[in-house]
A protein has these predicted regions:
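Polyanion-binding surfaces on beta-sheet-dominated domains and ring/shell assemblies
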Residues: 1-119, 123, 147
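Short, polar loop/linker segments at the starts of domains and inter-domain junctions
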Residues: 79, 128-129
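Solenoid-repeat scaffolds in large eukaryotic assemblies
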Residues: 124-128, 141-142
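Repeat-associated, polar segments at repeat-unit boundaries in modular proteins
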Residues: 135-149
Length: 149
């Protein structure tokens, strides 16, 4: 179970708003590239260019990479969002904590699923599911736990 307060982490949306509000980024571009090699794992690279000239010469100010298991219909979107957030953090938009809220949500999600992978019986999985539900785990996590049964 996660031992951190998600409200202490900026969302990628908040970082993007700060980025675009900065006048020096008025000509910037945020480009995402799919580097996935198979259907099991999404791998996304984000490149931030501050000017058209930087993009034309392929000189990004910064990059960010993220990966996400292709576990549901929204895995690609989460991966792209995380990649953008990492690129912004690698530049100057990390806020008070470097990881984005979305990245920390992934950690929280992984805690339950990782724990499920180490259990050996259906009864243990049922107990874990009940704990996750009692702790307000997302529907996505609960559905992921069901896959272990």
């Amino acid at each position: 179970m996660a031992r951190f307060d998600l409200s202490q982490y900026a969302t990628v949306e908040e970082r993007l708003k700060t980025f675009w509000a900065d006048e020096k980024n008025s000509d910037a571009r945020i480009i995402t590239l799919n580097h996935s090699k198979d259907s099991a794992l999404w791998i996304i690279e984000t490149r931030i260019y501050l000017t058209a000239g930087d993009q034309a010469t392929d000189l990004p100010k910064t990059t960010g990479w993220a990966s996400e298991a292709n576990s549901d219909a929204f895995a690609l979107e989460r991966c792209e969002t995380s990649s953008i957030g990492r690129a912004l953090a690698n530049y100057i938009y990390s806020g008070s904590k470097r990881p984005s809220r979305e990245e920390m949500e992934k950690v929280a999600r992984m805690d339950w699923l990782e724990r499920a992978g180490s259990l050996g019986t259906i009864e243990e999985l049922r107990d874990l599911y009940a704990q996750a539900k009692a702790n307000n785990a997302s529907q996505e996590i609960l559905e992921g736990l069901k896959l272990y049964a």
